[in-house]
Amino acid sequence: IMINASIVLEGGATRGVFTSGVLDYLMEQDTYLSHVIGVSAGACNAVDYASKQIGRTRNCMIVEDKEYNYHNNLRDFMREKSLLDMDMVFDKYPREIFPFDFETFRKSCEQGMVCEQVTTNCITGKAEYMIETQDFDRLLRICRASSSMPLLCPMVNIDGVPYLDGGLADSIPIRHALHQKNEKIVVILTRNPGYRKKSMTKGMAKLYRRAYGKYPE
């Protein structure tokens, strides 16, 4: 069943498991919304929803086999400049360990589903809503960029442009969803009700300026 509606998927690292539970239930009911917008971890959920792979996001986020753990130790963090093993998550997982069904993903898009991943363009400081339905490698890079948290992960270059986590520029892209003019919008949040983001401390602001001083705020 394809419903003419938008669904917005907030990020939140492993809190995205909550989102995956909601999407798994929708897939079990064979219910698909026509326009999916994912941010950060939500981008990973979005593509798994379009590929109709029940349980895949959960398996990727909660890995029981230590051999496939994606958290870097201190030594690897210093060497890779990344808290997470992004090669594991966005290369080995989709190609070998938890194979991503790109053909089903592509067919879903051909049948009318629009699947967007939100990234932050580090040159402009603005959100970009990216769509890729033909190039598997590029889709993985877009998901990687959307999930690359500042300070904790390196920038990701796509077509010569550096990108970071989509949540920096548009963490809950409801306004973008409204522009699509669908009658209904479903929003899946991963924070507790009433959550308000705290202001950045002076120390953290200084750290950001040191790391990204040449880029827009």
State where each predicted segment sits.
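Patatin-like phospholipase
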Residues: 1-39, 47-217
